Amino acid sequence: MAARHYIIMADIISSRYIKDGDFMGQFKNLTILANERFKSQIVSPLTITLGDEFQGIVNNAKTLFELVFFLEEQRIEAGHMFQLRYSLVHGEIETEINTKIAYEMYGPGLTHAREGLQWAKDSGHHYHVDLKPVPEAQLKLCLELYQSIKSEWKPREYKIVAAFLKHNDYKDLAKMGLYKTRSGAWKKGKSLRIDEYHTVKRLIFLILNHG
């Protein structure tokens, strides 16, 4: 009997145009880090399936978003130039779950997740979400805001952004030598919309908790 599972698929946006020859190694390392970090919450590990695409299955909707945020923040901290597009689906899988590698599984949930990834590609979106009964309209709006904040961060700012995301106190940034004064760090944090970034993440988890 088919059971419903929380599915994540992602691919690299415009991979054919990326000039960094090591981006596939970087992509693979991201999945390795995520599989290690979320070992206890992963049902079937993130597995690269089509060169520039991975899929996996996790235990709940909260983990899906924790995983997305982890991947994005790790990508920024490492200074990777590529961007990822995601499909998050709660759907049926008819075959037995492969807990070792995300291969040899079939079901309408996986089909829908792949179709969602294609929809995101065709429409220019970064996220496709279908997690019924969780209210997806609110999640989609939050993800649009989340993406709008991230899209303003330039690659040359990734080191600074990563420092802001790791350190809550502006004094820590001054100690790291990134800013001479606390006020300078505060102004940069405002321009990067770091507080708004953290707020939209909290809002997503509130929606999930009350969905």
Regions found by a protein language model. Name each.
Residues 1-211:
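Regulatory and interdomain segments flanking nucleotide-handling catalytic cores
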